[in-house]
């Protein structure tokens, strides 16, 4: 039964109302520093920990709760007579509820002007110590680290005479250990990222010890293949606009492949300013287009490769209206993603309940790192978030691209970044015309892209081509020109650049180089 609570929080969200409710239930309140003042100012009967222990706060607040009267009251097992006798002998009451959250270390180090001294002063000592003590003794002590749990705790206390069940206490304790692990991980990441100049030096993006924290969203039916098990985890600091923030409106449970392909579709479509549609199959775009609205963008994207679009993942960067929904509903689609769906659009899919509809708010946030597991290790890199601007392009041929060709080249280049290497993408009039992906040779990707366009009945005459990496020989260029391309965008940087540029001049096409490669594995 909860008779006495100790409250000490940095994040004071909802704490006054929570404390008022506890007091109304007859719970005695202990508190420290600013929290105690806040509760007292709210008219609550609260005892300062310094008065409770008979030992004053000292060392600028570094020592407040590190006292046997605090930790004895938390750690004592109520089912062991010798523990309770020890408390009685030393005049230590039990502390049955601990409400603590920690100094804002992560928020502090995020500031541009944060110094090592600032960071050190925001490493909480007493808070984690109390939290771990209470979590260890969760059979007898309720511990709350998240303000979102205040209402849950109060509801159960009211329903059970100020008592919480073991399952609730266990769940709350596991949250504590996860929280303190993340907190210590952030401290380690920060300290091991510092260079030799500890006071003024810059931090490395790659600390000597890397701690990552993710919370499980759900278990999945299976992994990439049915014989593999899997689960989906969310970054504890999920950026705005990320796939993990999705809200599923209808449809079957998402699978491993659904989530992977949805991420590829969403990351690609949200890079466009104009209304856009991206259709993904096996993490590769098989159709990308912009249009006057979502419906037009979809019609153009679908036209690229109707065969591959079957059973694909479709993403929009605009609200899906009824017209777009009706067009999509004519095809078999696994997942449909958009910032929003009109009520009429939702009604279209009522008869197709297996279609998964995901809403995700648009946002430009990105993951801090791109991660790839290898045997016994982890490759960590910054995201490939470079979007080349027109002023950064360099024309290397005698003929310059026309304004329309330049628009098509920039569109093709944006798409190529999301195609598995080796990537060749034909585009024109704001849509993909043929996509060659994942081939071991660039010339084969070029051939496949042209064949795809031919199969879809699309002409490549006057098209623009993007290559995610340089042409090692002129053969790939010869293939795209023979197919009808009149301009090419590529990174450049090959030892045979002169040969490739000479071939472009020979064909009287325009070529621009970006100086940026977009390998994607």
Curated annotation (Swiss-Prot):
Residues 1-145 form the MGS-like domain. Pfam families: AICARFT_IMPCHas, MGS. InterPro entries: AICAR_Tfase_dup_dom_sf, Cytidine_deaminase-like, MGS-like_dom, MGS-like_dom_sf, PurH-like. Pathway: Purine metabolism; IMP biosynthesis via de novo pathway; 5-formamido-1-(5-phospho-D-ribosyl)imidazole-4-carboxamide from 5-amino-1-(5-phospho-D-ribosyl)imidazole-4-carboxamide (10-formyl THF route): step 1/1; Purine metabolism; IMP biosynthesis via de novo pathway; IMP from 5-formamido-1-(5-phospho-D-ribosyl)imidazole-4-carboxamide: step 1/1. Its EC number is 2.1.2.3, 3.5.4.10. It catalyses: (6R)-10-formyltetrahydrofolate + 5-amino-1-(5-phospho-beta-D-ribosyl)imidazole-4-carboxamide = 5-formamido-1-(5-phospho-D-ribosyl)imidazole-4-carboxamide + (6S)-5,6,7,8-tetrahydrofolate; IMP + H2O = 5-formamido-1-(5-phospho-D-ribosyl)imidazole-4-carboxamide. GO terms for molecular function: IMP cyclohydrolase activity; phosphoribosylaminoimidazolecarboxamide formyltransferase activity. The keyword Hydrolase applies. GO terms for cellular component: cytosol. Keywords: Hydrolase, Multifunctional enzyme, Purine biosynthesis, Transferase. Gene3D superfamilies: 3.40.140.20, Methylglyoxal synthase-like domain. SMART domains: AICARFT_IMPCHas, MGS. It comes from the Bacteria. Coiled coil: none annotated. GO terms for biological process: 'de novo' IMP biosynthetic process. PANTHER family: BIFUNCTIONAL PURINE BIOSYNTHESIS PROTEIN ATIC, BIFUNCTIONAL PURINE BIOSYNTHESIS PROTEIN PURH. The IMP cyclohydrolase activity resides in the N-terminal region. Belongs to the PurH family. This is Bifunctional purine biosynthesis protein PurH. It comes from Burkholderia pseudomallei (strain K96243).
């Amino acid at each position: 039964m909860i008779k006495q609570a100790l409250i000490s929080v940095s994040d004071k969200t909802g704490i006054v109302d929570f404390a008022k409710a506890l007091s109304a239930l007859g719970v005695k309140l202990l508190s420290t520093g600013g929290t105690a003042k806040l509760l007292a100012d709210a008219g609550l009967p609260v005892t300062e920990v310094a008065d409770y222990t008979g030992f004053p706060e000292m060392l600028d607040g570094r020592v407040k709760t590190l006292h046997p009267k605090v930790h004895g009251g938390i750690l004592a097992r109520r089912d062991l007579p010798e523990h309770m006798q020890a408390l009685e002998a030393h005049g230590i009451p039990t502390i049955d509820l601990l409400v603590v959250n920690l100094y804002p270390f992560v928020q502090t180090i995020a500031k541009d002007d944060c110094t090592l001294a600032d960071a050190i002063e925001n490493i909480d000592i007493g808070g984690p110590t109390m939290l771990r003590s209470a979590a260890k003794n969760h059979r007898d002590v309720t511990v709350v680290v998240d303000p979102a749990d205040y209402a849950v705790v109060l509801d159960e206390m009211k329903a059970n005479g100020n008592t919480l069940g073991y399952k609730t206490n266990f769940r709350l304790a596991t949250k504590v250990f996860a929280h303190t692990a993340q907190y210590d991980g952030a401290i380690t990441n920060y300290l091991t990222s510092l260079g030799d100049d500890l006071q003024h030096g810059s931090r490395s993006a790659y600390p000597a010890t890397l701690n990552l924290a993710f919370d499980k969203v759900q278990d999945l039916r299976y992994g990439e293949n049915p014989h593999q098990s899997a689960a989906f985890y969310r970054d504890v600091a999920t950026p705005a606009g990320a796939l993990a923030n999705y809200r599923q409106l209808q449809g079957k449970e998402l699978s491993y492949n659904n989530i992977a392909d949805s991420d590829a579709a969403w990351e690609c479509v949200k890079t466009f300013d104009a209304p856009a549609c991206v259709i993904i199959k096996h993490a590769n775009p098989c159709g990308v287009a912009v249009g006057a609205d979502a419906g037009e963008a979809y019609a153009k994207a679908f036209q690229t490769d109707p065969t591959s679009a079957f059973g694909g993942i479709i993403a929009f960067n605009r609200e899906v209206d009824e017209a777009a929904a009706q067009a999509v509903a004519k095809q078999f689609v696994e997942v449909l993603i958009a910032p929003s769906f009109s009520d009429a659009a939702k009604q279209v899919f009522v008869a197709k309940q297996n279609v998964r509809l995901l809403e995700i708010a648009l946002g430009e946030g990105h993951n801090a790192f791109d991660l790839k597991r290898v045997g016994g290790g982890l490759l960590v890199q910054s995201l490939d978030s470079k979007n080349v601007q027109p002023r950064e392009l360099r024309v290397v041929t005698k003929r310059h691209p026309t304004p329309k060709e330049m628009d098509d080249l920039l569109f093709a280049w944006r798409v190529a970044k999301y195609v598995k290497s080796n990537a060749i993408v034909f585009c024109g009039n704001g849509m993909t015309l043929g996509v060659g992906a994942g081939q071991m040779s660039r010339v084969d990707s070029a051939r496949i892209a042209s064949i795809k366009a031919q199969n879809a009945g699309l002409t490549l005459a006057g098209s623009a081509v993007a290559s995610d990496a340089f042409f090692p020989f002129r053969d790939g260029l010869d293939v795209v020109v023979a197919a009808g391309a009149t301009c090419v965008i590529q990174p450049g940087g090959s030892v045979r650049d002169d040969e490739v540029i000479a071939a472009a001049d020979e064909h009287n096409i325009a070529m621009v180089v970006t100086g940026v490669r977009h390998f994607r594995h």
